[in-house]
Amino acid sequence: MGMLKNKSGFTLLEILVVIIIVGVLASVAMPQLFRNVERSRATEALQSLGATKRSIEGCAMQFNNVYTNCGTYALIGMTDPSYNATTNAGAHFGYAIGIGASSFTLTATRNTVENGVATDTIVLTVGTTGAVIRSGTTAFAGIQ
């Protein structure tokens, strides 16, 4: 009689089942991951817009609540948080200030760097009463 040898290892079928399970889990988890990444980037934009809003309001107080003297980042004492490959390559939005005599609009537009969609925007409009209207085309324009 011959001696039986113990064989160890996985069969091809077991390996294929594990690969299929991992693939299914990844297909469920990846869209959620990308959604959370975009949500965090939209939060970045809202924080920058909020800081800009406060700086414009502080600047306008110096000019009897007239916003026309506060239309650039230099005039409000801020560095433009827009994407610049040499200074802040991590920024995911470009920013613009639109100024009227008694109101202003701040716009964050998603950069196409890192697969952003250039048509995604977040807009804050501050009217004469100081009320802030949030709008935009990105899925997270209305996040609180």
Where are these regions (language model features)?
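Ser/Thr-glycine-rich phosphate-binding loops at phosphate-binding pockets of nucleotides
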Residues: 11, 28, 36
